[in-house]
Design a protein with these regions (language model features):
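Short Gly/aromatic-enriched secondary-structure transition segments
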Residues: 69-86
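Glycine-rich, small-residue loops and helix-cap segments
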Residues: 4-55, 93-97, 123-126, 136-138, ...
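Mid-chain, well-packed structural core segment of small domains
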Residues: 104-148
Length: 174
């Protein structure tokens, strides 16, 4: 018998929300139950729960701590956690864009470790943040030097036209 059937038979309501403090290799969620006339209350509880959930997000350029676009993260409730390096599988480029920005691409053969900042981005703010990202940047999995996998900025290959490689520097500087 599934949860939905149990709720209906018992005259209850329920809402499922994702939970990200467990092992991130498998999806995990929590179901909040209440009496059928309490839907508004469990929606409020779910909303509060989601506001406390966050995902680690890696940035290598203009969104780094103290850089010009950091406010795009902090205004959405993101908080700086740490400065770390990626695993040695990335190449970094100074893109030919206005404004100029870095582009990081995965390359397990000629890559190097790149300096990134990790922010905790509230789950409820992810959509608003994604709406601000412009091509050729994209979001993907970024492997850190300690083996963690986090979401972060990457660059699509076509964005490297006329770009200057700065992998040997190991970080982006304004």
């Amino acid at each position: 018998m599934c949860i939905r059937d149990s709720c209906n038979l018992l005259d209850m309501c329920a809402i499922a929300v994702p939970e990200n403090t467990a092992d991130t290799s498998i999806p995990f969620g929590i179901t909040i139950f209440s009496l059928s006339d309490q839907e508004g209350e469990i929606l409020g509880t779910a909303e509060q729960f989601l506001q406390t959930q966050s995902i680690p997000f890696a940035v290598c350029g203009l969104h780094k701590k103290g850089f010009p676009l950091e406010s795009q993260l902090t205004e959405l409730g993101a908080s700086y956690r740490e400065s770390v390096n990626t695993a040695p599988h990335y190449r970094l480029y100074r893109l030919d864009t206005v404004p100029e920005k870095p582009g990081m691409v995965y390359d397990d053969k000629k890559g190097a470790a790149i300096a990134v900042d990790i922010y905790e981005l509230p789950v409820v703010s992810v959509g608003a943040f994604l709406g601000e990202i412009r091509k050729p940047l994209c979001i993907g999995n970024v492997e850190l030097s300690d083996g963690r996998i986090v979401k972060g900025f990457l660059c699509e290959e076509y964005g490297l036209a006329n770009a200057k490689e700065i992998t040997d520097i190991g970080k982006y500087e304004v």
